[in-house]
């Protein structure tokens, strides 16, 4: 199985289309969406149409915090993120809201745990943003029975950057920053936590979309960066009347 891992799409249809096309060109035959399908971006309907169709064909799909926000926008929150949640809610029909509301927070594929945020209380939307947080995430996956093996691979989104935290000689997890397109051996015997990056809103100074491809048969993980028409995605945000900050973020990757 070659499993394409896509997270934090954020209603960016241009980026999603580019990543799906690239993943298929790399031999991806299964797909997993790790949450935050909507929010920030201008095309939640187009993105959900694609993801819902792919779920019907066997894709794994999880709920992220922005998906939950689109179902039930917060009241009294005047932040830019909350305002896009309210806008997104208004764009969706009842079937799309029902779809988002009933997505699971976690799922498993063989020895792999899929989760949007940390496996430590997934509903709290905690970030895996360093070695300590990765250790807490991995320990929670083992202790709570979310992973069915002693050396699980925990694959997460939420943080909008790509890092592999792998089990070293001791108990600690070591961070590794990948080179796009270069495969990394990922044996089942070594526990790890992987942040797969963001399809629809990169934040590391590179506007190219991110996803990862896990060849489970070969035990190899490859992180990818994919160019797409981020100018068109940014212009769509402006035309929708959403905050300029989110358009600028797509153009700069920050």
Where are these regions (language model features)?
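N-terminal active-site segment of His-dependent metallophosphoesterases
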Residues: 1-57
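Anionic-ligand binding region
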Residues: 138-154, 159-183, 189-191
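Active-site neighborhood of phospho(di)ester-bond hydrolases with catalytic His/Asp-centered motifs
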Residues: 6-7, 31-35, 40, 60-65, ...
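Acidic, His/Gly-rich catalytic cores of divalent-metal-dependent hydrolytic chemistry
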Residues: 167-254
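Glycine-rich, phosphate-binding/catalytic loops in enzymes
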Residues: 22-23, 48-51, 79-80, 131-132, ...
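Beta-strand-turn-beta hairpins that frame and shape the catalytic cleft
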Residues: 1-3, 107-114, 187-193
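Active-site environment of divalent metal-dependent phosphoester hydrolases
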Residues: 10-15, 39-41, 66-71, 120-122, ...
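Active-site neighborhood of divalent metal-dependent phosphoester bond hydrolases
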Residues: 48-150
